[in-house]
Amino acid sequence: ELVTADGEVVRTSEQEHPDLFWALHGGGGNFGVVTSFTFRLHELPQVTVALLLSPPEAGPEVTRAFRDVVESGPDELSGGVLYLTAPEEEFVPEHLVGKLACLTVVTYAGPEAAAREAMRPLLELGFEGEMVMEMPYAELQCALDDPPGYRVYWSAENLSSLPDEAVDRFTDRAADLLAPSPSQHVLFAQGGAMARGNPDFPVPWRTAPWVVHPFGLWEDPADDDRVRQWVRDVCADVRPWSMDAVYLNFLTDPDPDRMVAALGEANYGRLTEVKRRYDPDNVFHLNHNIAPR
């Protein structure tokens, strides 16, 4: 259910306003204000999470090992590699606190014993900091929420493959991350069930097996240019493997060409037609905008 630009309350489904229902599955906030929705959930009360910390120089080896484990593992296995400022946590060695480090976060939709077996080749590398635990899925979901009060700039590239050269491009650029800061330089796995959803919806990015997602969080305006350029450089480095399509929420300031690439040219054409039908005056424009034709 949503309120359209002319104040009408509209219910959408595959049978009611199916064009609008389609557009709302990936087209962002361009078509109205959603007031309620119904969706299907899968019960997953507990997950297993491994936090594996390394010095930054170990990043290339760790990233390759993580890639190999995920690509050969079951759908239940996922996660990412993050370069970040190491926090003061129980599993973090004192000599790494406050310094740039490489954190591998492995997630498993199942019990710890099965998780350890699935990621065994990765664990055999040995890490300076290690913690494996079961936790509620909801707790994992909010574990990497951004802290409030910071300046923010981020982007992403969805990769169709992750060869060794792409790993090197990703890990090399970590040296330019602003540290100490809450900024993070992230590579995470997709695929699995998400890649097998309805292919008709305008979310072509979800078939990508890998995502590179640099995001800057900083306080001093004097660092604005440095952080923004770092984000752009990261994306440029891995663009040879990019499929162009990308999750809109990962784009800070997309230009029109990037919007078309993010959604796919055919999808973008359909979305502009829906926009013209429900918001011809572009009332909803303070967003990742799709202009009406």
Walk through the language-model features, giving the residues of each.
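Soluble FAD-dependent oxygen oxidases
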Residues: 1-293
